[in-house]
Design a protein with these regions (language model features):
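Register position in tetratricopeptide repeats
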Residues: 39, 72-73, 106-107, 136-143
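Canonical positions in the second alpha-helix
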Residues: 51-52, 85-86, 119-120
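Structural marker of alpha-solenoid helical repeat scaffolds
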Residues: 55, 89, 122-123
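Canonical tetratricopeptide repeat
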Residues: 65, 99, 133-136
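Terminal, low-structured helical/coil segments at or just beyond the last alpha-helical repeat
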Residues: 114-154
Length: 154
């Protein structure tokens, strides 16, 4: 009798886990579609990114994508909340770190962006995200230095 109960429990548990995995995959697919259509239909991309969060509210990638779409839409403050949620679920998600740091740069929060760069370098030193973020930070620093020099000249 105990073996039957254990078998039923394990079967049910396996069923639940397989359902969660498929919801996660659906959420990822919806998020990827949102990124793909952003340039042609911003409103639809925003709706899709929200649907991805409904499909799996604990999907760090979906939160990062939703934040990135807001960032691209220049809604930096709103985007920040989505990136925070993404990094709560997965503090090493390279897309979450990269897009969040780009958002920090847009908000002139260079210390936060540099912290995320350090995490990216430690977790995926050769990945595209760490290289692109380093370039973005260098560009922002050059702009800041150039502005400082032109201000001093006046």
């Amino acid at each position: 009798m105990n073996i039957i109960k254990l078998s039923l429990f394990l079967s049910f548990f396996t069923f639940i886990l397989s359902g969660q995995t498929s919801l996660n995959q659906i959420s990822n697919d919806i998020s990827n579609n949102a990124l793909l259509i952003y340039e042609t239909d911003k409103d639809e991309a925003i709706l899709l990114s929200r649907q991805a969060l409904v499909a799996d509210p604990s999907n760090a990638y979906a939160w990062a994508v939703a934040g990135n779409i807001l960032r691209k839409n220049q809604e930096f403050k709103k985007a920040e909340n989505f990136f925070k949620k993404s990094l709560e679920f997965n503090p090493l998600l390279k897309e979450g770190l990269y897009w969040s740091a780009e958002n920090n740069i847009s908000l002139d929060q260079l210390d936060e962006a540099n912290q995320k760069l350090k995490i990216l370098i430690n977790s995926c030193s050769g990945c595209n995200e760490s290289v692109m973020l380093k370039l973005s930070l260098d560009k922002k620093k050059a702009q800041t230095n150039s502005n400082d020099v032109s201000t001093k000249d006046n």
